[in-house]
Every structure is written in C-alpha cells, then in structure tokens.
Amino acid sequence: MINLPKNCVVFTYPKMGDSGKFLPAELRGAAGLTGCTLQCKAYESAFAQIKALGFELIAVGSMGEAGTSEFKRATGATFEFINDEKFELEAPLWLETFTTGDGKKFYHRQTLIFRDGKEIKRFSRIAEPEQDAQNILAALRNL
C-alpha cells in the first residue's frame, strides 16, 4: 500500500493516449475522460493555495514510471505524482476504474480529500477537469 500524507488532496487522471480509441461504448462521449493536461496545469496554478490551507497534493495515474515522469515534466507540475500501474490504491481507496478494448486499465477521474488520515470528501467522475482545482479549493476553504 502506498502511504499518503495525513492531510492531502488526491486526484486520479485517466491519461489514456492511444487507448482512448478503444473506449467501451458506454464511455464514448462521456464528459471528463479527456483534459488531463488542463487539470494538472490548473492544479499547479492552485498548488500554493492548497499548501497554504495545510494540504499536500498528489496526482495518481497508471501510465508507468516513464510515462508518469514525462507527463509531470510536460505539465510543469511541482506537486507529487504517483505511478499506480499495479492499481494498489484501487481497493483501499474504493477508486473507480475502467478497461479499454485494447485491455488497458485506467482510473476514472476522481478527487479525494483526506484530513488527519481519513477521507472526508470525494468527487467522482469529474466532468470538467479544468475546473477541478478551483472546486477543490472552494471545498477546502469550507471545511
């Protein structure tokens, strides 16, 4: 199990690349399956405010070490990224996943807020990734 900080925001991103061509019929056209880069850049812009509120920020994806490192570099993100290609967080955090027609598994876009090591808020299947960071900042301010 991956250890998370006691106070943190964890968001999962699908970043499917070419596997997006093989989405199952029920997910084709679903909101929120694209926009990983925009979401990460928005979180980078909000990172200082999230830290000032006493929370760490962690992005979780399943791209492999090299893909995760390259994606983090490409977005200019300074917060932590976790490569969870073995889906070690799926069961303990009750994270939703999906599988594409080419047999690859991904996390749905979700954001969880933890305080004192306990999940206190969850946002599932985020439809507007570029708005997620601002929505989370509002939620953190209202805790």
Give each language-model segment a name:
Residues M1-L143:
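Chalcogenol-based redox active-site neighborhoods
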